[in-house]
From Swiss-Prot:
Root EC class: transferase
HAMAP family listed in its UniProt record: DNApol_error_prone
Protein name: Error-prone DNA polymerase
Subcellular localization: Cytoplasm
Pfam families: DNA_pol3_alpha, DNA_pol3_finger, HHH_6, PHP, tRNA_anti-codon
Originating organism: Mycolicibacterium paratuberculosis (strain ATCC BAA-968 / K-10)
Domain of life per record: Bacteria
Length: 1093
């Protein structure tokens, strides 16, 4: 296994589990099957050596990375690597309006021994950089002179972004910048958008002198330098001479820069293309205004000396200034704010009191649960030793807020290993009963704060986030950023746009990309011009824009902007850091993850619906986790809508695993992640579970840790327990081993711990090296693959709860899932179709019966779709309609409705199409005919001024037309499925319905047909593509080998519905059709798939 290769392939894991040798010619370190879903790996410098010491000292003081978002074409790491190769004395990173790349820049520079200068180019104009091809307004280039200058710059960047009121529009106050500088900044006159160069271009030398005088008055002559650049343009020399001539008059320095926007010359074309994208133009149309970038790459001191031979002192002055401004990003990270505890308490004592109070509720008295209380004492001691009581108090406070506001939440991940978290009500898993290792969560050797993920029902999460802002103050709390990078589809689309291809061509090429990872000969890029592919390849993985992390929040004891600027997110009332979670971790910012979980919302809705319509109060904590009927349902793979086990891969595994007890659900959650199992391979656990393979242990000392998973290591906690049992590690040492073997592997730590493991196993058990080799190899193989058992336990509870509702209250379960959309694996159409197959009647929307969202009728046995699901209506208008009905009674007619609610023609016609006027005794065609006239009748208009309201005799719609209308209006056909209208034709062709495939002998060839609901090609599947087809009787999993997919690629990639001839595989109870040929069927009713998600 290699150090940096990520999780092993399934085939490699099976080989390790079975203690088999590698096959001849097989690499010891196979390439990973797909992209890692882990955090950013530790930066590793390239192998190429550093250039010889340059004879001409030079520092680049004006450089943009890709974190200037479409105005830089190299990563900060690439810029540093090139600076090291060129032997620059220092490198400044001066991205637009932010310090987005500062941490990556600092990490790479530390590895390569490059001195760092931190700065930013401030956009002083009134508009966003992407609002116009060449937005007006000057720029100010600021270099921080040391840590204090950095702090002041960061605070001013944050102030400007927040003052702008919206994302991407910082509003600077030049007077405030002047006051903030305080001698801790150095100002360069900058590029063509700088005050001085802009004045020179617009008004000549006198105007330039006035602009320079203003900068000197504001910041001081010792803190201002004239910047000269030379990009090979005709007027470069004339402009530089005019600028340099101003220096003696004002007593300022002169420095040479390249104004770099990329590391090396090879990225010039990409930089131009990104500039065109920024301006929403093509390269051809942007050519007239796009800034020249021919020479905008890093250069050596010798090359700069040749370019500025007429003024060599400008080159050496740049080196001197760079060395003056350079410093390392050794920021002292803020701590958590002191937690407000009652008088007479410290944070430690208050945490102890809260924990012991909760422990009595969870465990009873200490006499009844001595193990639990001993574990709590141990954990409290470690927490106090590491000075983390405030962290736990903050998390407890968030959980308390959720409970008091009737918001479902639960901690998950490694936090569930903590008895303190369990006692505080943060987690729902008893770590003592489940024998979980606390050190997986927190140990004395840990080099950072613990990581507690809080799952919060998604529809209520915003309340929790705003509570944190209100509780700690917006200056002290912010969300963590998510850097949105270029991937295949958007890379091809944007580069095609930059090269001037039409919108339709951009769409077509983008749609044909599924999982393209770069090769120019991939079938995914067939027919796309080479120049598009070349640029798309170059731009892949570069930042495109800044998003917001799914739930990470940082809380500090001093303004966060002292360390990192904050700006507005797109979402209303959300402020976000300019750094992602990896940057925050590297600097030591304390992060809390408040994650929205749709299933928690669905469960809450289900609880409320069952209570309201059936009078049954459901307490999730009191459900019988051993109920056989729940496990029987899951063993049939009847799990559409069920949390975590509804994917096709999970459904294929459930009949093989045949869950019987709760722990089987824990294993099921861990077995299939992140997606379907690699095509054709079956996990050794299932073979052992079904008695096909014997349960074996390489050494008796492994049995205690692996007994409950039949000798197969699945969980990270088992890896740690094996180190304890086999080699005598302490729990803290075992956690060090787990982390050393993890995604950020350390060669030196691995070497030391490997030696410790071998010595320990020899001393403790006298095991021979052959046995130790096999044991250690298994630990290494599963270090990355292993799932936290605590995480699986937390999720398994939700698997059971959602399964229980599906079994006992299918109508409420369906309505709850519809309310909680968007969530889960299946579309609302598939969820409703599954509910019908379970005997649930579903009614369409009705203006006098529906709520804004889905609800129940007929004593909770039938579902009524919500008005918010109707096209053009939405939740707000739907809620307004419902409130009007409640306040003033049911609507008596279409005209009564439109008189009381001013609906547009479009909205009225959409409701008519959805059948929402059936309560008025109108057919759909009649309602559609009358909708326009009714919508134009207003109290302020004379009667009859609108369209004619006379409704002629109209024929009713056919079932097919009704279904098409339903799907158009709501995306759901409540009482039909598109394939049923073709059933006679399909029967005549010999097509087997999905529900009858179970009776087809294994290996037989069949013809099946259905709407495509999903297309997936997981990275672990060796090129296999999985399709999910659905007809009116059920669903079927279709496996397409790479050869079949290649032969039918265009059809398979785009057809809404398919005819598939293939071979049935159902020997294990999980039905799959291995496709041999694909054909098209045409559905009269629309259907959409969820592809490659």
């Amino acid at each position: 296994m290699g150090w940096f290769n990520g999780p092993p392939s399934w085939a490699e894991m099976e080989r390790v589990l079975d203690s088999k040798p590698r096959r001849a010619g097989e690499s010891a370190a196979p390439e990973p099957d797909g992209p890692l879903s882990r955090g950013r790996a530790t930066y590793r410098p390239p192998d190429e050596g550093r250039a010889a010491r340059s004879s001409v000292p030079y520092a680049e003081l004006h450089a943009h990375s890709a974190f200037s978002f479409l105005d830089g074409a190299s990563t900060p790491e690439e810029m540093v690597e090139e600076a090291a190769r060129l032997d620059l004395r220092a490198l400044a990173l001066t991205d637009h309006d932010g310090l987005y790349g500062a941490v990556r820049f600092a990490e790479a520079a530390a590895e390569l021994d490059v001195r760092t200068v931190f700065g930013a180019e401030l956009s002083l104009g009134p508009s966003a950089r992407t609002e116009a091809p060449d937005p007006p307004g000057p720029h100010l280039l600021v270099l921080a002179r040391g840590p204090e200058g950095y702090r002041r710059l960061s605070r001013q960047l944050a102030a400007a972004h927040l003052a702008g009121g919206e994302k991407g529009k910082p509003r600077y106050d030049l007077d405030a910048l002047t006051e903030a500088a305080g001698g801790h900044w150095h100002i360069l006159t900058g590029c063509r958008k700088g005050h001085v160069r802009q004045a020179l271009s617009d008004g000549g030398p006198d105007a330039a002198a006035r602009a320079l005088a203003d900068l000197v008055d504001r910041f001081g002559a010792a803190r201002v330098s004239i910047e000269l650049t030379r990009h090979g343009q005709p007027l470069d020399d004339e402009r530089n001479a005019a600028l340099a001539a101003l220096a003696p008059r004002f007593g300022v320095g002169v420095v040479a820069t390249t104004g770099a926007h990329f590391a090396g010359p090879s990225r010039r074309r990409l930089a131009m293309a990104m500039g065109a994208i920024r301006a929403r133009e093509s390269l051809d149309s942007a050519a007239g205004w796009l800034a020249p970038l021919g020479g905008s790459h890093l250069r050596s001191g010798a090359e700069m000396a040749r370019l500025f031979a007429w003024r060599p002192q400008a080159v050496t002055a740049a080196a001197e200034l760079g060395e003056q401004c350079a410093f390392g990003l050794a920021l002292i990270a803020p701590r958590l704010p002191p937690f407000d505890v009652p008088d007479g308490h410290t944070e430690d004592s208050w945490l102890r009191q809260l924990t012991m109070t909760g422990a009595r509720d969870r465990y009873g008295s200490p006499e009844h649960a001595p193990r639990a209380y001993a574990q709590i004492e141990h954990e409290l001691k470690v927490i106090a030793q590491l000075q983390f009581p405030g962290y736990f108090l903050v998390v407890h406070d968030i959980a308390r807020f959720c409970r008091e506001n009737n918001i479902l939440c639960q901690g998950r991940g490694s936090a569930a290993n903590s008895a303190v978290c369990y006692a505080l009500g943060v987690t729902a898993v008893d770590p003592v009963a489940n024998e979980l290792l606390f050190e997986r969560f927190l140990s004395p050797a840990r080099d950072g704060p613990p990581d507690i993920d809080m799952d919060i029902e998604s529809d209520q999460r915003e309340k929790v986030i705003q509570y944190v802002y209100d509780r700690y103050g917006r200056d002290y709390a912010a969300q963590v950023a998510n850097v949105i990078t270029y991937r295949g589809k958007i890379a091809v689309r944007d580069m095609a746009r930059a090269l001037g291809y039409s919108q339709g061509q951009q769409d077509a090429w983008s749609k044909q990309i599924s999982s393209w990872s770069g090769p120019a000969d991939s079938p995914d890029v067939e027919g796309i011009p080479p120049q598009v592919i070349d640029l798309a390849n170059q731009v892949r993985n570069l930042p495109r824009h800044l998003g917001i992390h799914s739930g990470g929040m940082v809380i500090c004891d001093r303004p966060i902007a002292d360390v990192c600027p904050v700006e507005w997110a797109r979402m209303e009332n959300r402020s976000v850091l300019q750094w992602d979670k990896d940057d925050c971790a590297a600097i030591g910012l304390v992060k809390f993850d408040l994650l929205g979980l749709g299933m928690l919302s669905a469960l809450h809705y289900a609880i409320d619906l069952v209570a309201e319509h059936k009078g049954i109060e459901v307490d999730l904590a009191r459900l019988d986790l051993s109920e056989p009927a729940v496990y029987e349902m899951l063993a049939r793979a009847d799990s559409v809508g069920v949390f975590q086990v509804e994917s096709r891969a999970q459904m294929a595994t459930l009949p093989r695993l045949k869950p019987r007890v709760f722990y089987d659900l824990v294993v099921e959650v861990a077995l299939i992640r992140p997606g379907p199992i690699q095509g054709g391979s079956v996990h050794p656990y299932i073979r052992r579970r079904n008695g096909v393979d014997p349960v074996l242990y390489d050494h008796p000392s492994m049995e205690p840790a692996l007994r409950k998973t039949l000798g197969v290591p699945l969980f990270q906690e088992q890896l740690m327990q094996l180190a304890v049992d086999c080699a005598g590690f302490s729990a803290a040492e075992a956690d060090q081993l787990r982390r050393a073997m993890g995604s950020k592997r350390s060669t030196e730590r691995m070497r030391r711990l490997r030696s410790r493991f071998y010595d320990g196993m020899r001393a403790l058990h006298g095991a021979p090296d052959e046995v130790i080799d096999r044991t250690y190899e298994k630990l290494e193989a599963f270090a990355n693959f292993g799932f936290p058992e605590s995480h699986a336990l937390s999720f398994a509870s939700l698997v059971f709860y959602s399964s229980w509702f599906k079994l006992h209250h299918p109508a409420a379960f369906c309505a709850a899932l519809l309310r909680a959309q968007p969530m889960g694996f299946y579309s609302p159409q598939s969820l409703v179709a599954d509910a019908r197959r379970h005997g649930v009647t579903v009614h369409g929307p009705d203006v006098n019966a529906s709520l804004a969202h889905a609800t129940l009728e007929n004593a909770g046995t039938e579902v009524r779709l919500g008005l918010g699901a109707v096209r053009h209506i939405g939740d707000d208008l739907a809620e307004k309609l419902v409130q009007e009905r409640k306040a003033n009674g049911p609507f008596t007619s279409l005209l009564d409705l439109t008189a009381r609610l001013q609906l547009s023609v479009q909205q009225t016609e959409a409701l008519a199409t959805a059948g929402a006027f059936g309560c008025f005794g109108m057919s759909r065609r009649e309602a559609l005919w009358a909708a326009g006239a009714a919508a134009t009748q207003r109290p302020d208009r004379l009667p009859g001024v609108g369209s004619s309201s006379h409704i002629p005799a109209l024929p009713g719609m056919s079932e097919l037309e009704l279904a098409a209308a339903d799907v158009w209006a709501t995306g759901i056909s409540p009482d039909s499925y598109p394939t049923q209208f073709l059933r006679d034709d399909l029967d005549a062709m010999g097509v087997v319905p999905a529900a009858r495939l179970g009776s087809v002998p294994d290996g037989d060839r069949v013809l099946i047909a259905g709407a495509v609901t999903h297309r997936q090609r997981p990275g672990t599947a060796q090129g296999v593509t999985f399709l999910n087809l659905e007809d009116e009787t059920g669903m079927v999993n279709v496996l397409c080998t790479p050869g079949v997919w290649a032969r039918h690629r265009k059809l398979a990639n785009t057809a809404p519905a398919l005819l598939v001839r293939g071979q049935v595989q159902n020997a294990s109870g999980a039905i799959t059709v291995v496709a041999e040929r694909l054909g098209r069927i045409t559905l009269a009713v629309g259907s959409r798939s969820r592809d490659f998600r």
